[in-house]
Amino acid sequence: MNKFNVYAAWSTLCVSLVFPSVSKAGQYTNFDVSIYIPVGVVQSFENPQKLADDWARISRQLKVDKVYVEVQRNRQEANDQLLEQVKKFFLAHGVKVAGGMAASDGSIGGQFKTFCYTDPKDREFIKSAAELAARHFDELIQDDFFFNTTKYDSDIAAKGDKSWTQFRLDLMDDVAENCIIKPAKAINPKIKLVIKFPNWYEHFQGLGYDLDKEPKLFDGIYTGTETRDPEITDQNLQQYESYQIIRYFDNIAPGRNGGGWVDTYSIRYIDRYAEQLWDTVFAKAPEMMLFEWSAMLRPIRAGERTNWADLRTSFDYNQMVSAWSANAPAGLEPSVARVAGYSLEQVDSFLGQLGRPIGIASYKPYQSTGEDFLHNYFGNMGIPIDLHPEFPTNADLILLTECAKFDPDLVAKIKSQLAAGKSVVITSGLLRALQGKGIEDIVEARYTGRKILARRYLSSFGAGNGTVIGDEQASDVLFPEIDFLTNDSWALVRALAEGRGYPLLIMNRYSKGILYIWTIPDNFNDLYRLPVEVASALKNYVMRGFPVRMDGPAQVALFAYDNHSFIVESYLPVATDVRISVAGGKAKLRNLVTGEILTGQPDNAGGRGGMDDEPRMRFNAHLLPHSYAAFAGEP
């Protein structure tokens, strides 16, 4: 059985990851890199020497293909002469130039405030800003403030009997068309208009972001992949979202998702910034946008990384600084731009060997909510997710969370999948939402509303004794209770509370297919507290037939591709061991960075109840903190 340390993946890169020379665009093989320049920074370029000095410092550390020059933010506008001056500078340096604007109107104590789009003066201001951009640029991106928060008297009167969600959807569709698109194209018919959607996609519709109509109104979309710190921020976004949201938006606007956008905010250690960049391009984003120019010039703060500071992790801080010091002019310290450059140069060396991203098909209808962001917790458990805005009928197995309830025809679609011999996994939240709406015609299981606190677990398949799995000293987890009919449904994984078993995964045969019900903890973070053996028992069914699988602790993600390549990435602050299982006759794994060949052993894990009989090979991996490894399967 082979074992390796992830730091070996970077040993051959150390020589090449050194201080880059000042250069023109087109330096990356698998993606472009761009920087967004807010209007306040643009105005500082009234002094042309500052622009030249900034560019000299940034371009020494980072290969830049494109910049986005902002024309307006918080009612602060750049003038025509300055915009032309800045544009000409970058074009002269071989850098592509686009415009940007932010429809923000300041804040109230840090709480975002938008324009009031029922106020004719605000509408006219936004229109004039779009026209300003159109006079100077052939592309314009809307920063992620293109939503509405105001509930002024004029808004209340215009809303009438509509819900706030419907009112704001209609309002922002109108603003997009009549205050941005038509005015800009009247000035510059060839301008490409792009809307950047932020990271809080579960709640878009409530503030007027329309994932259904706006991608059709605009020429392109862009994706906010900034997940920052999952604990200290108010959003608590999970790391996997930096990858998953790109894939979801790719499925919304195939071929028109321009890239991912990451900032430097709310991180406790510098590795977290690198992880957001990596995960964005692991999803095959064509462009990596860095927000923003002045942040690239700030000193690097390594942060709270003492536990792994001396390890050869994927973001090898010491190696980065050492390589810089050996090549940089005396006294010139690296800035955040070098962190971005170092991180992106690493992954650019192997991304071209990865195929098309794949995952477990899942479904989030337009304008839906329910079990918000749960898909990203699945991703952090090592379950790759491929999220779609339309029901993915071609998938052999579909994983449905509560948000799918917004499809009025959902039960009929589930029946069709099962009748076709396919499998459907629904969460306990979706079961609760579908009670009384037809789910009983498939399975008579019930979300009771009662709760159980458990720390012991069993697995089984048919009648008889179950097998104890996991550490009996595991943490307590609070689950909802699901009732089912004995012998109609079967509990595959159970939680034990004071000697009584409660189902965590139920299977029910319907027509030619199988319906599974997955009981989700009240606190999604408790998914990470499940013993490894319990998570593995769940994956036996949820990932049935998937070509690659990773078993190990939570907060280790798996990114899979359609050419038998994959990446495993740990977000943990400690080293960890994982087991990898691959199908498709792949007896070896080739490290895509070092070329090392790993030879596997037959995977006789069993425990799948005869549900997954395809031969598989297993490999062991040792991952250092906040590190990843990339592989391709070979015969």
Model-derived segments and their meaning:
Residues V71-G106, K159-I187, K405:
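Aromatic-lined substrate-binding rim segments of carbohydrate-active enzymes
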Residues Q61-R73, F125-Q166:
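Active-site groove signature of glycoside hydrolases
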Residues Q43-Q61, D119-A133, H203-E214, Y269-T280:
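Short, acidic/polar
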Residues Y28-D53, Q81-D138, N148-Y152, N178:
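Active-site-adjacent "subsite" loops/lids of carbohydrate-active enzymes
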Residues H375-N376, E402, F406-P635:
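A conserved amphipathic helix/loop scaffold
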Residues I37-F45, Y68-E77, G109-K127, G160-D174, ...:
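The substrate-binding groove and active-site-proximal loops of carbohydrate-active enzymes
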Residues G110, D138, D144, T149, ...:
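Hydrophobic targeting/anchoring helices
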Residues K50-N74, L132-I141, I221, L277-F291, ...:
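Catalytic domains of carbohydrate-active enzymes, especially glycoside hydrolases
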